[in-house]
Amino acid sequence: MSIDLRASSLDPVQIPGWRWQPFLDEASAALKPFNPSPYPIAETFLQKEGSTGSKAKPVPVTTATWACSTDKLRQVRCACVEAGMAASVLNFVINPSCRFDLPFFGADLVTLPNGHLLALDLQPVDKADPDHTQPVWERLMPLFERWQAELPDGGPIPEEAQPYFSPAFLWTRIPLGEEGDELIERVIRPAFIDYLQLYLNLVAEAEPVSDDRAELLLSGQKRYTAYRAEKDPARGMLTRFYGSEWTESYIHGVLFDLEDAA
């Protein structure tokens, strides 16, 4: 699909062979009751074609961005990458408005030549603030416990990253092939739906906060997005596909754009 077929960030993403299509379809359908509007995304980031691999055997690469906003959600965006056997990626993040006491929603679903790396969380804006975390965690932990029992553990979280994840961070590494495909369909997909539905329930219930509270939440959101932009694990892959200038503009101007948008 060429860029000119997607004139808006809300236009459907349809990339041949992209394995995470059902997840984006579920998310976009779940968001419709919130009356989403297109989020402004520059044309170069709506959909971009490239290649990887050798000159003798180039592999086509497509990267697309689906995005929207609502009255309570500043930015909802999904970065979609399909590069054949090299990579297939869904990176879906919901950034709430600081006028509402909400966490982030995050889903990283990554297929690489050595396996699937899969992560889901409702990530806290301020992990040290029980008024922010406890109403979420008491509803999220039962979902985590249900699905975590079905999956191998993904390994430890680096200490510097721990402030940005909840105790219900669902994180796994699973193999390619039939075993991985079965776990994705039986566990990861329903877990994604459960986490997202809880998040959207929280959004529906959220009431505006005071100006002082909004300032505190905005500060926490900026810390989170600055950390994510600095440590984005896709930086190396995207740089190989499209070069450093495009990649840095994408990371700072689209994926984690709060500093520019605030």
From Swiss-Prot:
Keywords: Oxidoreductase
Keyword Nucleotide-binding: no
Paired cysteines (S-S): none
Keyword Amino-acid biosynthesis: no
Gene3D superfamilies for this protein: 3.40.1500.20
GO molecular function, one term: phycoerythrobilin:ferredoxin oxidoreductase activity
GO-annotated biological processes: phytochromobilin biosynthetic process
Chemical reaction(s) catalysed: (3Z)-phycoerythrobilin + oxidized 2[4Fe-4S]-[ferredoxin] = 15,16-dihydrobiliverdin + reduced 2[4Fe-4S]-[ferredoxin] + 2 H(+)
Documented EC number(s): 1.3.7.3
Pfam families in alphabetical order: Fe_bilin_red
NCBIfam families for the chain: PRK13249.1
Family the UniProt entry places it in: Belongs to the HY2 family.
Purpose of the protein: Catalyzes the two-electron reduction of the C2 and C3(1) diene system of 15,16-dihydrobiliverdin.
Name of protein: Phycoerythrobilin:ferredoxin oxidoreductase
Species of provenance: Parasynechococcus marenigrum (strain WH8102)
Organism ancestry: Bacteria, Bacillati, Cyanobacteriota, Cyanophyceae, Synechococcales
